Amino acid sequence: LYGDCEFTLRDTPGHVDFSAETERTLSVLDYALLVVSGSEGIQPHTETLFKLLCRYSVPTFVFINKMDIAHLSRQELMGGLKKMGDCFIDFSAGVPKEEFYDGLAMCSEDMMEQYLDTGTVPADAIRQSIRQRQVFPCFFGSALKLEGIKELLAGLEEYTAEPPRGDEFGARVFKIFDDPQGARLTHMKITSGCLKVKDVLHGSGWAEKADQIRIYSGAKYQTVDQAPAGMVCAVTGLTAAHPGDGLGVEAGAPSPVLEPVLAYRAVLPEGVDAHKALSALRKLEDADPALHVTWNEGLQEIRVQLMGEVQLEIVQSLLKERFGLDIGFDQGGILYKETITSTVEGVG
């Protein structure tokens, strides 16, 4: 809560190995805050994330962090951002007004006309241009030293607006997780209408009742009787919904852009039943469909698909913590997307 605005924050992993999880979250955002390291500048992964934000049409603010240890100037950092698009505008308080409005005017014809007529650009026009992804506001600071944070929050309060919501129920599932008691939690964003406890939700070939609606803040939560449009909540009682599913009038998320690039074979220690290990991995796959867990009956092998070593370590840790299974994996191999489909003849 800041000023008169209440924000629901969805933090996503910054490491490239968890890009698929980040992508799933983008489909439920009203706005995104893209954090860039001032000490490292624009990285390839920054460009990948910005392309994903473009694909999902998410209005985007930028916070350039670690300016207390930055080796690059503001001008150099803004130059790096502008290589991804022209309309990254410095919203810092120290920017001269004429320079600020000049930059905004170059981003849309409407703002250009208003600037030429009045010498300024009203907040409503700026807000609309941000919503339409014509402008990407940039703020500078240091999260560690709390520098620039109030300025950023004030900018979010001033230049964001609640998007229009319909009356008929719609929701988008973005995460599946089990609570400490083993209850399956279906995390969703209510995109329109309202969800009430005991409402029956329908999916592809299934219909299940929402037993409980939880609003989480960290590890703590409170139960509510209903969740209105715009709210992010976790619902118990659903067993068939998966990340990316659309409920009610909401369409499902498009096929993900980012897919695993490596395949690993599970190495089971002596005495561990393969089917028990498969069941555990299937539960992890329920939360992360990109794992693509497969079982080869002939070879008695389990294979999973991952983005890299960091994600592999997390999977091993989850298997040990949640299921008591100390499972190893082989060196892994590249997932080739092309293969020979017919007879070929070598010459030479």
Enumerate the predicted regions with their spans.
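Residue-level signature of catalytic and energy-coupling elements of molecular machines
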Residues: D11, T25, L33, T46, ...
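Switch II (G3) loop of P-loop NTPases
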Residues: C5-F18
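P-loop NTPase catalytic nucleotide-binding module
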Residues: G38-P180, L201, C233
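Conserved nucleotide-binding/hydrolysis modules and their immediate coupling elements
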Residues: Y159-A161, G166-A263, E301
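Inter-motif core of Ras-like GTPase G domains
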Residues: S19-E40
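Charged, conformationally dynamic linker/hinge segments
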Residues: G252-G348
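Gly-rich Lys/Arg/Thr-decorated short loops/hinges at beta-loop-alpha junctions or inter-strand turns
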Residues: G3-F7, S27-L33, C107-M111, P256-L268
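Active-site phosphate-binding and catalytic loops of NTP-dependent enzymes
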Residues: F18, D86-F91, P122-A123, Y159-F169, ...
